[in-house]
């Protein structure tokens, strides 16, 4: 319950402070040859997901791997992590990796081994993502209907929705080791995609309805409902 409250509170803090908000790309300090790689963990609202944070930029973007077969094609790091029997999902963003574990394992038993592995992998400059991943990600998103070109009043509404999600929701969700992406808008229904720790999180429905849907309906009268799909 405490984690759920923190998750919702973080989102409302971004919503209530409604001044113009421009999200700058975070500039992480790139370790030099003499700078040790640091790594620590952060809890997420999803008890099955844990955030592993390092002081090195891993990937300026988002990469969500729910299947080892997709990871094998595009991410050596995710592929290596899927080699552990307790890893169910891998999400890479900026300077952190969110790992979702299988239900029959506890973090107490596996966390230290994962920390040591990720730290060693990053320290040895292991490849995170293969060239061409961005293009493949765009192709997959196009198949899901993401990137559909709206026109007229719908285009204006969709732009407002995207701006609110990118400016107020994404930063809060990212702090919890997850991600949210706009997918579609149809007759007042907004569909978003949840990734990382948000996928399968027990509190995601509360956050979606009490936070995201409430904000969009309040700021954009055309919005009637927000629904989600898992990444």
Task: Annotate each predicted stretch with a short phrase.
Residues 7, 14, 21, 25-231:
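Domain-level signature for proteins that mediate thiol-based redox and metal-cofactor handling
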């Amino acid at each position: 319950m405490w984690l759920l409250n923190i998750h919702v509170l973080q989102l409302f803090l971004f919503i209530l402070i409604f001044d113009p908000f421009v999200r700058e790309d975070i500039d992480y300090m790139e370790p030099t040859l003499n700078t040790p790689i640091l790594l620590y963990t952060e809890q997420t609202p999803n008890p099955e997901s844990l955030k592993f944070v390092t002081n090195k930029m891993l990937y300026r973007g988002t990469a969500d791997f729910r299947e080892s077969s997709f990871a094998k094609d595009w991410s050596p790091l995710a592929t290596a992590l899927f080699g552990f029997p307790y890893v169910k999902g891998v999400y890479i963003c900026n300077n952190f990796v969110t790992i979702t574990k299988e239900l029959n394992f506890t973090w107490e038993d596996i966390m230290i081994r994962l920390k040591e592995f990720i730290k060693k992998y990053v320290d040895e400059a292991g490849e995170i993502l293969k060239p061409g991943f961005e293009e493949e990600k765009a192709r997959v998103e196009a198949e899901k209907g993401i990137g559909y070109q709206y026109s007229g009043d719908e285009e204006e509404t969709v732009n407002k929705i995207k701006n609110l999600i990118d400016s107020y929701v994404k930063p809060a969700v990212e702090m919890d080791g997850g991600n949210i992406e706009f997918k579609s808008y149809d007759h007042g229904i907004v569909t978003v995609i949840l990734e990382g720790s948000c996928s399968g999180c027990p509190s995601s429905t509360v956050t979606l309805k009490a936070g995201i849907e409430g904000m969009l309906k309040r700021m954009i009268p055309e919005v009637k409902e927000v629904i989600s799909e898992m990444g």
